[in-house]
Curated annotation (Swiss-Prot):
It comes from Aspergillus terreus (strain NIH 2624 / FGSC A1156). Its main location: endoplasmic reticulum. This is GPI inositol-deacylase. The gene is bst1. GO terms for molecular function: phosphatidylinositol deacylase activity. Its EC number is 3.1.-.-. Coiled coil: none annotated. InterPro entries: AB_hydrolase_fold, PGAP1-ab_dom-like, PGAP1/BST1, PGAP1_TMD.
Length: 1160
């Protein structure tokens, strides 16, 4: 029987294959004993050998075609007397396999086959993978199950009609065949026809996001048309003030993917500027417009951008074809302003940097004339934790725009919306679209060429509609108004409450006639006093006939000399008595703050219930007034109630003096006394990170019999960005926030980074009950926060692991001649380099977070004012995991652990795929006449005495390959296409597919021949394949953009991604491996270059891989270039050798002078 050995060395088989061999004892398949003079002699003999043994156990040469191994002429073979003691130690691996078959004790000395198999893994690797899988499952489960709020969005009603602006053709833009411009008209509401478009108002342009549709605007546009038709056009005062309809235009980007390709982003911005110019020109044509000819022609357009459409909107203002002041208002929804959503493409990262630098530079100018964006307002609206497409942290513009020109707000903050939204529902949610459209109507002023009010007024409108009114920057109108109501009271009236007493009305209309309750305003000079009023009724404006009106009054005539002789309202409660008190009052309805209703039946803040009305003033805001008048105008008893009081900050504000460590260890517990104010504010500065979730419990302990007017209402808020969340009928709350987030650039204002979370709790103080509050870190829920903040970690950290594994594999290979399996390399890395590198990265992360701080400044926006002041480093959080808190140092080893498990999973998935494909490949080979286990072309030769093979001979091809001419032509064509037409990412995909086929063939041949050299080659190709798989996602996104362009018949080549040097090393490396040629060992000092390159890739993947992932391809490309160099220069570079490498037959040469080698 023809016995098979494992083909392993015999001297070292009893030892671990990773143990170093001594230099004096060559081993492995590349052991060399040169004999130059023997090479031509063997080449000329043409002897073939049969490896069958005779009765003595010795192998004898026989001429048999079915089982002969042809001796390549390059094999350096020395015919020596047999010496069993030294032959196995000195000969290379392939020769040792020949001798092993001739030896009776071959099986005992051979390397066990199970150690060569790529499937087994060590206990350490298995336990690490199991632990990583458990962490990964816990994170994904937490992300899927964490509390994100219910749906809650109303369904909009619309009748859309989209009019294609066919006139916007190639005469106006070079993108006319790719993009399109449309005008929205609401059927049955907007008058229009093909001759006259019915343009009558202010132009608004909608920009869809990444792969988004222009039809997403229909809900906003329909609401604008219906609101104007049903409300605005009937309000003559608003019409006289310049309010008109909104003409919604929209751009069809053909579902282009600007998030993945920087040049596409710039192309869209160029098209938008050309579209804006065309839209403005439409209003000059009286045949297309129904505008009043006395009104000025529009010179500016309002832009609404969804997702990447918001970034395109900001980019338009930086383009060379931008017309100055043609855009002055930008509203974005779920737009990633601060950071690109993915960093896989260099142009996207560079374009983002250029755009953000332009905006920062513009707003850093001292004089408005030097700021091209002085008249621009930017409002960024984020959906919150329900948005699983773009991290809502990235919507922050605090690092770009001062609060005088814009702000960031969450949909859960907007009054009467109070709900988080996902990435798509933010475009159609009924409550949200109503707030957006009402705010737009309030900023429109068609009497101005800009079509909008001045910037300061626009900012006041946006703050009024988008902020709760409880923020420090919220503006109050009370001090800006003149008294318009004269309130006359009887002198002997008992309606004035004693100083400091709380006003409680449990029922309105109890007296069945109008009634007045006066609260005296405390004297000025008492610090921290605050007035609060809460009711379930709506406040009446002057002249309205409702149930409740709140006035702030001063004794008439006014003490400061401002005499007001004309009052629009006169409220007389004196009964005609001569001795009466007259008060000049201001109505406070415009300062009313809506809060979600909180009753025993409330479940969500967005429930369809009439909201509470709330007033809040600091005592300083009431300096001109002596009384607060609450006028109960109900004519019959109602269920309305009211609470009003003046409170001290010492009782109403609680600041928690504990750090993050205290929250983790013991949590926070406190009890509010029964005599507390209606509003209690708890500030926790240590609670600022967006990576941690908390569980808040509120327990009421009733001691009285008085029924509650309302159940506890909680507001969770942070100052920047403006994120507020309301919880009604609160008992148990999951607290998550978008505060200090990873990778975010620092804000322009230093104080924006501090402050922490504030909890405002409204409770009924009239029930004589205490309230217990407890706060604890929710570890399980916090795991889910890692998904959105660190998704791109799984594009970087696995490359760290793979690089260290490859480093270990090449170290062992260069030292011993064995190319160990991926799992063996991973096990070795887990015992040495990987823990040390992760430890070093953890220390670096902690050091960077500790040393991170903002430069001090007295400037309100904290911009550098002179050369001695250090500017803000907006990229300082790009390193490692981007954490600004040293507390999260453990995330580095955690993600390293998870990525080890992910790499193991991908390794086995790849092995399974290769095994399946190899099975079908074997079926094909058997049908084509291939004889199993007889393809011994790899073995260079044999003689009955002893055989020694050079390093060159051991690297022979193990399977046939196309002719070198064909491979050169294919490579040249591919590189030519890369330099002209296709992006190099397409060539990379081709290289991955070709290398997959190489791995399939390598695995099949290794299984069939049971040769260690075959297994070496398979392990080598498989590890390179794993590396290429992890690099593939970095390239696939640009490839999707390119393929999408082909689908929409846009055949203009990319202006970037045609550098052949970015792909040539990969192509040459893959071509070299298609010949079945094993990479030569590097035994000189140059072997350290391999380790250095791979270690550099690992360090870069850890430090910069998340923020600049696109460079990982280029680093891997450098590694591929080095491997190609090893192929070419291992035995000296020459044209002849280059030809032999391409041919895949390094062993065929003729070293004799003047000899000729025939081409195949």
């Amino acid at each position: 029987m023809h016995r098979r050995s494992s083909g392993s060395p015999v001297e070292d088989d009893a030892e671990d294959p990773l143990i170093s061999r001594t230099p004096s004892e060559p081993s492995g398949p590349n052991a060399v004993e040169p004999s130059e003079r023997a090479r031509p002699q063997v080449a000329r003999t043409g002897t073939s050998f049969d490896l069958r043994r005779d009765h003595t156990g010795a192998s004898t040469p026989r001429s048999r075609n079915s089982s002969t191994w042809r001796m390549p002429s390059s094999a350096t073979t020395t015919l020596l007397p047999p010496d069993p003691r030294s032959s196995s130690a000195a000969m290379p691996l392939t020769s040792q396999r020949l001798l092993a078959e001739a030896s009776p004790d071959a099986q005992s000395r051979s390397r066990p086959a199970r150690l060569r198999s790529p499937w087994p893994c060590s206990i350490l690797t298995a336990l690490t993978s199991l632990l990583a899988s458990l962490f990964l499952c816990a994170i994904l489960r937490s992300f899927a199950a964490r509390q994100t709020g219910g749906d809650g969005c109303g369904i909009p009603v619309m009748s859309p009609a989209f009019l294609h602006m066919a006139g916007f053709d190639t005469e106006h833009t070079r993108f006319a065949s790719k993009y399109n411009l449309y005008l929205y008209r609401e059927q049955g509401v907007d008058p229009f026809n093909h001759e006259n478009l019915g343009l009558n108002g202010a132009p608004v342009l909608f920009l869809p996001g990444n792969a988004g549709s222009y039809r997403q605007v229909r809900s906003l546009a329909a609401e604008a048309s219906r609101h104007y038709f049903e409300v605005v056009r009937h309000d003559q005062e608003r019409l006289r003030s310049g309010t008109r309809s909104l003409d919604f235009f929209m751009i069809d980007f053909n579902e282009d993917m600007a998030a993945f390709h920087g040049q596409t982003l710039l192309d869209q911005a160029e098209y938008v500027n050309e579209a804006v110019a065309y839209i403005l020109s439409l209003y000059h044509d009286p045949k297309r417009s129904r505008r009043d000819p006395e009104l000025p022609d529009p010179s500016s357009v309002i832009i609404i951008g969804h997702s990447m459409g918001g970034i395109v909107a900001r980019t338009t203002l930086t383009m060379s074809n931008y017309q100055a002041n043609s855009v002055n208002t930008i509203i974005t929804m779920s737009a990633p302003h601060a950071k690109p959503p993915v960093s896989f493409e260099s142009d996207v990262v560079h374009t983002y940097k250029q755009i953000n630098d332009y905006w920062r530079e513009a707003y850093s100018q001292t004089w408005a004339n030097n700021n091209p964006l002085w008249h621009v307002t930017l409002i960024s609206i984020a959906g919150g934790s329900r948005d699983t497409v773009v991290p809502s942290d990235y919507a922050s513009i605090s690092s770009l725009v001062p609060e005088t020109h814009g702000f960031t707000v969450f949909t859960s903050t907007i009054p009467d919306v109070w709900i988080g939204m996902d990435h798509l529902s933010i475009t159609w949610c009924d409550q949200f679209r109503k707030a957006i459209i009402k705010s737009l109507f309030e900023i429109v002023d068609v009497r101005r060429a800009s079509q909008t009010k001045p910037r300061a007024e626009r900012m006041r409108v946006f703050k009024k509609w988008y902020l709760t009114g409880l923020e420090p920057i919220a503006e109050r109108t009370l001090s800006q108004k003149e008294p318009n109501t004269l309130l006359t009271l009887e002198d002997q009236s008992n309606t004035i409450l004693p100083q400091g007493q709380r006003l409680i009305l449990r029922e309105l209309g109890h007296r069945r006639s109008p009634n007045v309750h006066l609260l005296p305003v405390p004297p000025q000079g008492v610090a921290g006093k605050k007035f609060t009023l809460l009711t379930n009724q709506r406040f009446d404006k002057s002249g309205e006939q409702g149930t409740l009106e709140v006035l702030f009054c001063s004794v008439f005539p006014l003490q400061n000399g401002k005499f007001s002789t004309v009052f629009t309202m006169n409220m007389d409660f004196s009964g005609g008595n001569v001795g009466s008190t007259r008060l000049a009052c201001k109505n406070a309805a415009e300062d009313a703050i809506h809060l979600p209703a909180s009753t025993h039946f409330s479940k969500h803040p967005y429930d369809r219930a009439e909201p509470f009305s709330y007033l809040q003033y600091d005592l300083e805001d009431l300096a001109e007034h002596q009384f607060v008048a609450v006028v109960d105008k109900a004519q019959s008893p109602t269920k309305g109630w009211l609470l009003a009081e003046f409170s001290d900050s010492s009782d109403a504000v609680i600041r928690a003096r504990l750090g993050l460590g205290g929250l983790l260890s013991a949590g926070l517990k406190m009890r509010l006394p029964a005599n507390r104010p209606m509003l209690t504010e708890v500030k926790i500065p240590a609670l600022y990170s967006s990576l941690l979730d908390y569980n808040l419990k509120i327990v009421r302990r009733n001691h009285g019999n008085q029924q509650e007017l309302f159940t506890p209402l909680l507001r969770q808020s942070i100052p920047d960005p403006h994120e507020s969340k309301f919880f009604v009928n609160v008992k148990d709350v999951n607290v998550n926030l978008h505060g200090v987030a990873p990778f975010m650039p620092p804000p322009l204002r230093e104080q924006a980074a501090v402050g922490g979370v504030s909890f405002q709790l409204w409770t009924d103080p009239s029930c004589d009950s205490t309230v217990d509050i407890s706060l604890h870190v929710d570890i399980a829920s916090s795991l889910g926060e890692l998904v959105m903040r660190y998704r791109t970690v799984f594009a970087a950290f696995p490359i760290l692991v793979v690089a260290l594994v490859l480093r270990k594999q090449f170290q062992v290979y260069d030292q011993t001649g064995y190319f160990i399996t991926f799992t063996e390399g991973l096990d070795s890395a887990l015992r040495s380099s990987l823990p040390m590198l992760l430890l070093a990265m953890s220390l670096l992360a902690s050091s960077l977070a500790t040393s991170s701080r903002l430069p001090p400044s007295d400037d309100p926006f904290h911009w550098p004012l002179n050369s001695t002041e250090s500017p803000i480093d907006f990229t300082k959080n790009d390193l490692l995991l981007g954490s600004q808190d040293a507390f999260f140092w453990f995330l580095v080893p955690l993600f390293g652990l998870i990525c080890v498990g992910v790499c193991v999973i991908l390794n086995y998935i790849a092995l399974a795929l290769l095994s399946v494909l190899a099975f079908f490949y074997g079926i094909f080979k058997s049908k084509s006449g291939y004889i199993k286990r007889d393809d011994k072309r790899l073995v260079p030769g044999f003689h009955s005495t002893s055989v020694t093979v050079t390093n060159e001979a051991s690297n022979l091809p193990i399977f046939s390959a196309p002719t070198p001419r064909k491979r050169m032509i294919n490579t040249a064509i591919l590189l030519l296409l890369v330099s002209t037409t296709i992006p190099y990412q397409f060539a990379y995909l081709v290289a991955c597919i070709v290398h997959l086929a190489t791995c399939v063939r390598a695995q099949w041949h290794a299984k069939e021949t049971k040769s260690t050299t075959h297994y070496n080659f398979f392990n080598y190709t498989h590890s390179i394949f794993i590396l290429m798989l992890w690099i593939l996602p970095i390239n696939i996104l640009v490839l999707l953009v390119w393929a999408h362009n082909l689908v929409v018949h846009w055949f203009m080549p990319f202006s970037s991604h045609h550098n052949v040097l970015s792909i040539m090393p990969f192509i040459l490396l893959v071509e070299a491996m298609t010949t079945g040629t094993m990479i030569p060992r590097v035994t000189t000092r140059f072997k350290y270059i391999t380790s250095l390159i791979l270690f550099s890739i690992a360090i870069y993947a850890a430090v910069y891989g998340v923020s600049y992932a696109y460079l990982l391809h280029h680093l891997a490309n450098i590694f591929a270039a080095w491997l190609v160099g090893v192929y070419f220069f291992s035995s000296g570079f020459s044209v002849r050798r280059l030809w032999r490498v391409l041919e895949g037959d390094e062993g065929t040469s003729n070293s004799e002078p003047g000899s000729m080698k025939k081409k195949p």
